[in-house]
């Protein structure tokens, strides 16, 4: 028997030998999407783990590793045009990985800015966040590619949610405008989030719009993409709808984790006392959800529900300690390799999954039962 803090420290130790001289960490391929990625994403994740390892052990080598990771994220290689972070190099997709890629890097820089008292990290994080156009009407952000090109709304809900969560972290050392945009997003969350009948969060972004708003949006260059999502909601064939539901089941815990971050940063916001959140949490605690995460390629092998669900349970004070501990142990049993101290089992993207242990840094220190 060991503890989660021991797992984090030992994995950070293993991570030290993976870090390159420029501070970067090995790149993966975005899990099931198989996108050629730059080191930016995994360096962002490992940065958080190194910070946690320093907090746990007070060993300077972890602080230095975190500092080196920050240096890489602030380098020209990570932001080649001085705009957004370059996360992937797939010629058929954007290089910023929508809002999602930026959220991961902003999350890491925001935490490092405070832990390392790094003013440049704070300034860059605020600058990149605010460079993304925010729609005052829909309370949503547009994507900005690495060369500064504005690409329109990110039409995936979890990307918008995670970008808001990263903004909540950035807000600690940023202009008031950052916090205000996140609060505006939270104010509109009940009309932005879309649920299945059982409380499962839908994957596509489909904000509530009446017929007049939809008609008006058709003539608006930026808003038109939201009309597309509304049309697709009704026109998708059954097979496509089943695939999307399976994806939503694999991403439900990922959404929960972002909601938990936001709730910790804005604990008094009224959205946390709505029926909306109650419905989401009720589904999360159901046996139906547990079964849905089994053999789902977007779940344990990619998004780690064993860290994400307990984070939400802790934050919103639901479920028992034993249930949370069970989720954590299930993820460790599935993914942790005790021989390497890395989260590399049961996945075809070992580099990315190893980096995603960072999500456990926000959890209580649970007992871990290794085989």
UniProtKB/Swiss-Prot annotation:
Keyword match Cytoplasm: yes
Gene disruption: observed consequences: Defects in N-glycosylation pathway, characterized by impaired addition of the fourth sugar of the pentasaccharide: both dolichol phosphate, the lipid carrier used in H.volcanii N-glycosylation, and modified S-layer glycoprotein Asn residues only present the first three subunits of the pentasaccharide.
Protein name per its UniProtKB record: Archaeal glycosylation protein Q
Function of the molecule: Putative isomerase involved in the N-glycosylation pathway. Required for the appearance of the methyl ester of hexuronic acid found at position four of the pentasaccharide N-linked to the S-layer glycoprotein. Either involved in preparing the third sugar for attachment of the fourth pentasaccharide subunit or processing the fourth sugar prior to its addition to the lipid-linked trisaccharide.
UniProt main location, coarse: cytoplasm
Subcellular locations according to the entry: Cytoplasm
Source organism of the structure: Haloferax volcanii (strain ATCC 29605 / DSM 3757 / JCM 8879 / NBRC 14742 / NCIMB 2012 / VKM B-1768 / DS2)
Outcome reported for the amino acid change (mutating residue 38 to L): Defects in N-glycosylation pathway
GO BP terms: carbohydrate metabolic process; S-layer organization
Assigned GO CC terms: cytoplasm
Presence of the UniProt keyword Cytoplasm in the record: yes
Domain of life: Archaea
The protein's annotated pathway: Cell surface structure biogenesis; S-layer biogenesis
InterPro entries reported in the protein's UniProt record: 6-hairpin_glycosidase_sf
Region of interest (Disordered), residue spans: 19-39
Keywords: Cytoplasm
Coiled-coil ranges per UniProt: none
């Amino acid at each position: 028997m060991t503890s989660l803090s021991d797992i984090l420290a030992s994995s950070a130790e293993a991570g030290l030998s993976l870090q390159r001289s420029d501070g970067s960490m090995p790149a993966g391929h975005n899990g099931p999407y198989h996108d050629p990625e730059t080191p930016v994403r995994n360096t962002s994740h490992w940065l958080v783990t190194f910070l946690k390892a320093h907090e746990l052990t007070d060993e300077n080598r972890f602080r230095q590793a975190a500092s080196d990771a920050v240096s890489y994220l602030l380098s020209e290689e990570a932001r080649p045009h001085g705009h957004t972070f370059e996360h992937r190099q797939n010629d058929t997709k954007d290089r910023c990985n929508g809002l999602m890629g930026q959220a991961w890097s902003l999350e890491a820089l925001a935490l490092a800015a405070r832990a390392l008292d790094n003013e440049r990290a704070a300034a860059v994080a605020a600058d990149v966040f605010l460079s993304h156009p925010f729609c005052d009407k829909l309370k949503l952000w547009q994507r900005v590619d690495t060369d500064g090109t504005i690409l329109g709304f990110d039409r995936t809900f979890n990307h918008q949610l995670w970008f808001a969560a990263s903004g909540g972290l950035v807000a600690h050392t940023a202009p008031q405008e950052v916090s205000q945009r996140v609060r505006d997003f939270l104010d509109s969350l009940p009309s932005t989030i879309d649920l299945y009948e059982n409380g499962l969060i839908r994957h596509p972004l489909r904000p509530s719009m009446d017929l007049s708003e939809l008609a008006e949006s058709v003539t608006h260059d930026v808003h038109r993409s939201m009309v597309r999502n509304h049309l697709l909601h009704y026109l998708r064939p059954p097979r496509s709808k089943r695939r999307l539901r399976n994806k939503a089941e694999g991403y439900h815990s990922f959404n929960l984790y972002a909601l938990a971050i936001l709730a910790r940063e804005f604990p008094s916001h009224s959205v946390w006392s709505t029926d909306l959140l109650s419905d989401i949490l009720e589904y999360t605690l159901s046996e139906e959800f547990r079964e849905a995460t089994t053999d789902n390629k977007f779940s344990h092998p990619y998004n780690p529900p064993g860290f994400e669900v307990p984070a939400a349970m802790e934050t919103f004070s639901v479920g028992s300690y034993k249930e949370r501990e069970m989720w954590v142990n299930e993820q460790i049993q599935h993914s942790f390799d005790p021989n390497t101290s890395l989260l590399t089992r049961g996945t075809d993207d070992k580099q990315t999954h190893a980096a995603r242990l960072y999500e456990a840094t926000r959890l209580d220190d649970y007992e871990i039962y290794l085989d």
